[in-house]
């Protein structure tokens, strides 16, 4: 092994068009600019089929991105798995689906999840397929608890999806049936917290969906239009709402009902799953709750058994980079703040909690701020940098990885000035890590998991608007080594080529199932 290796993941930093909406270029980033001008580098595909998603129209995300980075292979991912299991009928043949349908006799079936076709956390087509199948199998009452997106899709597109869903529900309202939207709210306000950053969001979702508490409206459309006029918020930030008839909620989630969480992505599905699933749940009070028949679209964490019941078998990712390095006795260090800590650990390790080898691995989490990221766009970049430099100086580890979340988390706010500042903070971190690499003798690899900050605007039909979703742009892969001029082979590469490159640099043998090394 020539040198220990540091991998820096600049979350949400792709190669944009260099225009006024490209915060990566607009920002003053002298370190990144210098690295791109002087170091071996290429650009990696970070979306679509390169990361296991159904088509190249599908934007990448941090989950599938870190899976690919950490396992050196392209696996069929959530959206693709679910789509296949719906098409071939295996979902409806599962014991879990059969139990949910049987249980709904004389009761209600509830569908909860993100309402869009963003294909990052969910897809409305999956919800519609499940609703139609439930109706075909005799379920009389089905209610939707919808979380509004505006993050993986255009910022104010919620009404398009609501209208699409309402059309289907009206078709399913045949004699004796009641199919309706019961509650909802913006995904960054209710239900979809992750990494235990803000349990208050989940509690708000519980009060809204389960207890039917909250401001009432005659329809989801009325709620969205009213809140937009009152608050000026984009979809992801709209407050919670309850749909009512004659002053009463259309549907609460009652004890004994069937409940399906139709999101396929794990990070923002785990907390609400725990609230439904666990008898010993203690994050907030659940007055009168004795339990429902609950299932997730996938199992979101196999090691922690979240949830206990699920409709589609998740990808079992074997032969990860961590497994290869542990087998070789390599000491590893993984670091980020709360918002991306799970990405450099759980997702990196193939959707598994815990460590492969306690003796060889150290994971460190810096708690994230619980304030809007546009108000503090530096996030914890300084603290991440300090910890990385400290651990490089210790020389305890041969492979260190960190994630700077700024480009993605601030990118999602759509506030250009904040994103530009966020990028400058990441560049400051890079500078210190490069200096430490020179001082202590490391090779540094710099990449990203997907784009976001590189495309902050989009133009449709001649109209330019703020973009808050990930981009389809490739991401940089840079090799910095002051003592060795590495040569990147010609070719077309994706995120899954990073792990093989790390192993090659270390002089180790990659598993046969892996993609090729870039060097």
Segments the model singles out, each with a brief description of its role:
Residues 1-519:
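Feature captures the catalytic ectodomains and active-site-proximal regions of enzymes
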């Amino acid at each position: 092994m020539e040198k220990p290796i540091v991998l820096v993941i600049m979350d949400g930093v792709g190669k944009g068009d260099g225009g006024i909406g490209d915060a990566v270029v607009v920002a003053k980033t002298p370190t990144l600019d210098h690295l791109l001008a002087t170091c071996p580098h290429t650009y990696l595909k970070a979306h679509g089929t390169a990361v296991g998603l159904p088509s190249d129209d599908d934007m990448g995300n941090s989950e599938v991105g870190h899976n690919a980075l950490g396992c050196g292979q392209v696996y069929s991912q959530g959206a693709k798995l679910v789509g296949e299991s719906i098409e071939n009928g295996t979902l409806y043949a599962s014991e879990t689906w059969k139990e949910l349908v049987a249980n709904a006799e004389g009761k209600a079936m509830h569908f909860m999840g993100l309402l869009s076709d963003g294909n990052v956390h969910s897809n409305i087509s999956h919800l519609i397929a499940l609703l139609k199948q439930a109706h075909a199998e005799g379920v009389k009452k089905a209610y939707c608890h919808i979380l509004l997106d505006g993050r993986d899709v255009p910022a104010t597109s919620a009404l398009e999806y609501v209208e699409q869903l309402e059309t289907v529900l009206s078709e399913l309202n045949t004699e004796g049936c009641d199919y309706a939207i019961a509650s909802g709210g913006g995904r960054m306000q209710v239900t979809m917290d992750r990494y235990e950053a803000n349990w208050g969001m989940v509690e708000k979702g519980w009060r809204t969906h389960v207890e039917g508490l909250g401001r009432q409206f005659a329809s989801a459309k009325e709620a969205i239009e009213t809140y937009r006029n009152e608050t000026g918020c984009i979809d992801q930030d709209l407050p919670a709402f309850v749909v009512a008839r004659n002053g009463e909620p259309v549907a609460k989630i009652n004890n004994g009902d069937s409940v399906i969480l139709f999101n396929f992505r794990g990070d923002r599905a785990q907390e609400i799953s725990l609230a439904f699933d666990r008898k010993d749940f203690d994050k907030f009070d659940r007055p009168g709750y004795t339990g429902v028949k609950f299932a997730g679209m996938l199992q979101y964490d196999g090691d922690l058994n979240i949830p206990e019941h699920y409709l589609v078998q998740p990808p079992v990712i074997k032969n990860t980079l961590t497994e290869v390095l542990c087998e070789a006795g390599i000491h590893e260090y993984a670091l980020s703040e709360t918002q991306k800590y799970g990405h450099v650990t759980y997702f990196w390790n193939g959707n598994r909690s815990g460590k492969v080898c306690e003796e060889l691995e150290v994971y460190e989490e810096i708690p994230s701020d619980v304030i809007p990221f546009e108000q503090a766009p530096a996030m914890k970049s300084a603290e991440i940098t300090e910890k990385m430099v400290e651990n490089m100086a210790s020389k305890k580890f041969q492979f260190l990885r960190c994630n700077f979340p700024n480009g993605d988390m601030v990118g999602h706010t759509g506030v250009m000035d904040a994103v530009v500042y966020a990028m400058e903070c990441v560049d400051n971190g890079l500078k210190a890590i490069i200096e430490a690499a020179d001082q202590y003798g490391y090779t540094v690899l710099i990449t990203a998991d997907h784009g976001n900050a590189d495309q902050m605007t989009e133009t449709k039909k001649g109209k330019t608007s703020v973009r808050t979703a990930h981009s389809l742009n490739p991401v940089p892969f840079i090799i910095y080594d002051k003592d060795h001029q590495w040569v990147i082979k010609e070719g077309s590469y994706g995120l899954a080529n990073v792990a093989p490159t790390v192993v090659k640099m270390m002089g180790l043998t990659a598993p046969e199932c892996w993609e090729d090394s870039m060097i």
